């Protein structure tokens, strides 16, 4: 009989809709929602331009001073929660989805940030093969506050607790110190404008996103800035392995500015002379000194303990 597809030898032509009982139900339409602007051709996985991009030599992507890339699920999410302005959110194809990634995508979409799903090889390239956990956020350069504003914010919620860095050149140390300051209720960090680590993607990553909450200021002259803080009532405490005051004897309840130098060089001469006292951390065994970020964490933890009493 005509139209009887069950008769012997009957073959249905492919591509016909006859016999279909389930429609798309709007699935195609929903799949296109919330993905942001269409990415360029070289970012579309199935486009010939993308295949050429993947097969090209993996050279580091040229970076400019106009943007910075924050890597990792916690740092990216903290940036978006803090309202840090961003221009693009990159998510690697095939990345395992968790609550942090889901919230990051939703927050980015809510504020109009372009969400680009890219090959993992491309994300490796723009991050110079640093650990990114399948997600990266492109942001403007870090916004440093003025040291006077840092002091004002600290005195608004006494007792003030600020940290200054002298000769710290490793951004991982800076990021770890930012994280400790956030963990122990510090108000901010002061770094020299020259010959110092700055808030880069590496520092963002090490801080686990705390850089979005802790203000950082730059000083053209660290010694002069410390003197201003001292004149405003802060007690300036230096950290050094040969300090004349043991941490056990430190009164951490006063408004404080804690100054730390590098593990190798320690505090510079002028900065050391700017301190009201220099504190050492009692240690057992043959260990002479601690990494700068570890030393800051130990001292801030002791100050926080005293302030809770």
From Swiss-Prot:
Ranges for the region named Disordered are 1-69
**Single GO molecular function:** RNA binding
Biased composition, Basic residues: where in the chain? 1-11
One term under GO cellular component: cytosol
Task: List the EC numbers from the record.
Answer: 2.1.1.-
Give the UniProt record's GO annotations in the biological process aspect: methylation; RNA processing
The residues listed in the UniProt record as binding S-adenosyl-L-methionine, with positions renumbered to this chain, are: 261, 281, 290
Q: Which domain of life is it from?
A: Bacteria
Q: Which major enzyme category is it?
A: transferase
Q: Which PANTHER family match?
A: 23S RRNA (GUANOSINE-2'-O-)-METHYLTRANSFERASE RLMB
The protein in question is named Uncharacterized tRNA/rRNA methyltransferase ML0324
Q: Which organism is it from?
A: Mycobacterium leprae (strain TN)
């Amino acid at each position: 009989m005509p139209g009887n597809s069950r008769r012997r030898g009957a073959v249905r032509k492919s591509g016909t809709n006859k016999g279909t009982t389930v429609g798309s139900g709007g699935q195609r339409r929903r799949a296109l929602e919330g993905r942001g602007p269409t990415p360029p051709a070289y970012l579309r996985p199935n486009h010939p331009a993308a295949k050429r991009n993947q097969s090209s030599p993996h050279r580091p992507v040229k970076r400019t001073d106009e943007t910075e890339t924050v890597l990792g699920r916690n740092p990216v999410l903290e940036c978006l929660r803090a309202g840090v302005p961003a221009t693009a959110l990159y998510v690697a194809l095939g990345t395992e989805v968790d609550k942090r990634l889901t919230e990051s995508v939703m927050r980015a979409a809510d504020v109009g940030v372009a969400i680009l799903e890219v090959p993992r090889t491309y994300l490796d390239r723009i991050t110079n093969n640093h650990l990114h956990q399948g997600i990266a956020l492109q942001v403007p350069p870090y916004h440093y506050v003025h040291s006077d504003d840092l002091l004002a914010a600290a005195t608004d919620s006494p007792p003030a607790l600020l940290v200054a860095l002298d000769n710290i050149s490793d951004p991982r140390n800076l990021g770890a110190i930012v994280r400790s300051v956030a963990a122990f209720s510090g108000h901010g960090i002061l770094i020299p404008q020259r010959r110092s680590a700055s808030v880069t993607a590496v520092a963002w990553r090490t801080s686990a996103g705390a850089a979005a909450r802790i203000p950082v200021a730059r000083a053209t002259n660290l010694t002069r800035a410390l003197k201003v803080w001292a004149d405003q009532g802060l007690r300036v405490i230096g950290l050094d392995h040969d300090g004349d005051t043991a941490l056990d004897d430190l009164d951490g309840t006063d408004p404080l500015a804690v100054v730390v130098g590098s593990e190798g060089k320690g505090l510079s001469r002028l900065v050391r002379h700017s301190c009201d006292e220099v504190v050492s951390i009692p240690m057992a065994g043959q260990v002479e000194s601690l990494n700068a970020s570890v030393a800051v964490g130990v001292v801030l933890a002791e100050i926080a303990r005293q302030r809770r009493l």
